[in-house]
């Protein structure tokens, strides 16, 4: 697993203070999600600053870390054959990245994600996150609801473009 430079979380209070810096519904969601978080998750979490255009996750690399997005924005990116970067999705509604693969039991990340502006994250080792969330009914239900909302929205968007004429897409 990766080793991160950053501020290591020592107490639940410190962990929740980081989450409470977040604004609005995102803060409410994260507070509910981590209401019964285990000490092991807190002690393993590291606060990390990420610069704009820095990769957080790279497709094909081992799925070893889950990231809580505290501040900033992230986007899914793909490299085309000519070396151009294609931004395919803004993850503004995603508060956590890196756990879809855990739920689907993939060993490697399926997408590359980079910061679309300077961002702050909490990095949690995937194995510790998984041990916690699969035994915390509250967190598991909240996370599954969020994942299903995202997937449903993506599929609706895919269908919209699938039935457009080439002229309309351009």
What feature does the model see in each segment?
Residues 108-110, 127-169:
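A small-molecule sensor/coupling module
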Residues 119-128:
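A short hydrophobic beta-strand segment most commonly corresponding to one strand
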Residues 54-117:
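Cyclic nucleotide-binding regulatory domains
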Residues 1-7, 164, 169-170:
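Phosphate-/nucleic-acid-contacting segments
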Residues 4-52, 101-103:
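Cyclic nucleotide-binding regulatory module and flanking cytosolic helices
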Residues 86-88, 121, 162:
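Short, surface-exposed helix-loop/turn micro-motifs enriched in polar/charged residues
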Residues 48-50, 91, 124:
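Hydrophobic residues at beta-strand termini and immediately following loops
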């Amino acid at each position: 697993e990766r080793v991160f430079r950053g501020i290591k979380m020592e107490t639940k209070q410190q962990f929740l203070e980081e989450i409470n810096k977040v604004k609005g519904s995102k803060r409410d969601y994260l507070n509910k999600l981590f209401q019964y978080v285990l000490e092991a998750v807190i002690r393993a979490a590291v606060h990390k600053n990420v610069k704009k255009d820095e990769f957080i996750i790279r497709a094909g690399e081992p799925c070893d870390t889950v990231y809580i997005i505290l501040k900033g924005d992230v986007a899914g990116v793909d490299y085309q054959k000519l070396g151009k970067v294609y931004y395919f999705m803004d993850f503004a509604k995603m508060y956590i990245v890196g756990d879809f693969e855990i739920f689907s039991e993939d060993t490697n990340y399926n997408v590359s994600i980079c910061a679309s502006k300077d961002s702050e994250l909490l990095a949690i080792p995937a194995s510790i996150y998984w041990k916690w969330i699969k035994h915390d009914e509250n967190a598991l239900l909240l996370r599954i609801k969020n994942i299903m909302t995202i997937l449903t929205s993506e599929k609706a968007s895919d269908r919209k473009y699938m039935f457009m004429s080439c002229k309309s897409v351009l």
